[in-house]
Amino acid sequence: MSFNHKTIEELHDLLVAKEISATELTQKTLEDIKSREEAVGSFITVSEEAALKQAAAIDAKGIDADNLMSGIPLAVKDNISTKSILTTAASKMLYNYEPIFDATSVANAYAKDMIVIGKTNMDEFAMGGSTETSYFKKTKNAWDHTKVPGGSSGGSATAVASGQVRLSLGSDTGGSIRQPAAFNGVVGLKPTYGTVSRYGLIAFGSSLDQIGPFAPTVKENAQLLNVIASSDVKDATSAPVRIADYTSKIGRDIKGMKIALPKEYLGEGIDPEIKETVLAAAKQFEALGATVEEVSLPHSKYGVAVYYIIASSEASSNLQRFDGIRYGFRADDAKNLDEIYVNTRSQGFGDEVKRRIMLGTFSLSSGYYDAYFKKAGQVRTLIIEDFDKVFADYDLILGPTTPTVAFGLDTLNHDPVAMYLADLLTIPVNLAGLPGISIPAGFVDGLPVGLQLIGPKYTEETIYQAAAAFEAVTDYHKQQPIIFGGDK
């Protein structure tokens, strides 16, 4: 019997009633991972021994009836630090790195007796939108194994979509949770910047990065956010604002809610069938009692350019620490210190990472800083102001998560600009530090379409309220790929 169709609440009831044990649930999850892994390639590391040891310890002390997550397995993106479990960021540079500490998000999960079952595949150092830049493998879309799963958190999305695990963690710098969630038909949230501690997250773009949850349903996503969200003195950007329970508004109606639909989100570059899906969703929200009106976010068209200057600049600084001296990969053909640096970084980083380091170094260089990095920061402010103006009159923003459904493997990975443009709808949310969710909203050519809901800072509970209301009157979240046991 597989438990992957059970919700977290249903699994919790079984555990409390002792109809299953944490060990049995963990063993079954490991079986589900192994039986599907060859098809989708979600994991870099499966921590079988450690997970079973942890499950046995939980069984020994007993399941806490008041702790929903007690004994529940969790998959973790491989750029989030896990003590004594390989954390590679999908890079040759860190192919053998075992951290000596847990990320705060992981420590929070352990504190709730969650079981880290393994580390998921991703684009190298989270730089990519297809999980094809990984040093280890290419992950495949759960619905069509000839398509990409999205990125950079592709493994975390396919692990949930394929029924390997119920819950997973990813990170989102420019859409890296929401895009793969959309491509795989699951729920993925990028929280408000600072809601989840970045301590232990291998840094890419420090002003943009945020850890967030994947789950099959809106409520389970909120339940996982309840676990990982916390203020943290180890992260200077951690926010003190906290919602006691992110599920608190789920189940409430949305009558009177005002939702904005930016005309730019349905314009050039958006697949016509994606546009139709979003407009149908807008009508569904109106049927639920919300008001949906067209607005404008005029500076969003500059988002991709601004993002790739800022994110690459921050990456070029953050990745200086990988030099072959302290830990990780070191080139063995170096004759002096300079050659250690040059050869290690040349051999240890993949092409996309090196491309972004070079772009960022150029943007920060003398003579170009004002023309590129400084100007990008100024336009970022204009993008933030656009959102502020809309949220002065509206509760949420609605739009597609991605301009297309999942594209084919090996189709865009040799065209960086085309790959970058795939994030045009998610990037502005990171630039503004806002919360955004992707939920299943339909299918085009048999592939899932994601609907994005964006809110002002610290309004995750309102986003979940609206997302759950839509989910309650649709069945897209119930449809599953063949690999999960569905008929698609």
UniProtKB/Swiss-Prot annotation:
<comment type="subunit">
    <text>Heterotrimer of A, B and C subunits.</text>
</comment>
<dbReference type="GO" id="GO:0030956">
    <property type="term" value="C:glutamyl-tRNA(Gln) amidotransferase complex"/>
</dbReference>
<dbReference type="GO" id="GO:0050567">
    <property type="term" value="F:glutaminyl-tRNA synthase (glutamine-hydrolyzing) activity"/>
</dbReference>
<dbReference type="InterPro" id="IPR036928">
    <property type="entry name" value="AS_sf"/>
</dbReference>
<dbReference type="InterPro" id="IPR020556">
    <property type="entry name" value="Amidase_CS"/>
</dbReference>
<keyword id="KW-0436">Ligase</keyword>
<keyword id="KW-0547">Nucleotide-binding</keyword>
<dbReference type="GO" id="GO:0005524">
    <property type="term" value="F:ATP binding"/>
</dbReference>
<feature type="active site" description="Acyl-ester intermediate">
    <location>
        <position position="176"/>
    </location>
</feature>
<dbReference type="Pfam" id="PF01425">
    <property type="entry name" value="Amidase"/>
</dbReference>
<dbReference type="InterPro" id="IPR000120">
    <property type="entry name" value="Amidase"/>
</dbReference>
<dbReference type="InterPro" id="IPR004412">
    <property type="entry name" value="GatA"/>
</dbReference>
<dbReference type="GO" id="GO:0006412">
    <property type="term" value="P:translation"/>
</dbReference>
<feature type="active site" description="Charge relay system">
    <location>
        <position position="77"/>
    </location>
</feature>
<keyword id="KW-0648">Protein biosynthesis</keyword>
<comment type="function">
    <text>Allows the formation of correctly charged Gln-tRNA(Gln) through the transamidation of misacylated Glu-tRNA(Gln) in organisms which lack glutaminyl-tRNA synthetase. The reaction takes place in the presence of glutamine and ATP through an activated gamma-phospho-Glu-tRNA(Gln).</text>
</comment>
<keyword id="KW-0067">ATP-binding</keyword>
<protein>
    <recommendedName>
        <fullName>Glutamyl-tRNA(Gln) amidotransferase subunit A</fullName>
        <ecNumber>6.3.5.7</ecNumber>
    </recommendedName>
</protein>
<dbReference type="InterPro" id="IPR023631">
    <property type="entry name" value="Amidase_dom"/>
</dbReference>
<comment type="similarity">
    <text>Belongs to the amidase family. GatA subfamily.</text>
</comment>
<feature type="active site" description="Charge relay system">
    <location>
        <position position="152"/>
    </location>
</feature>
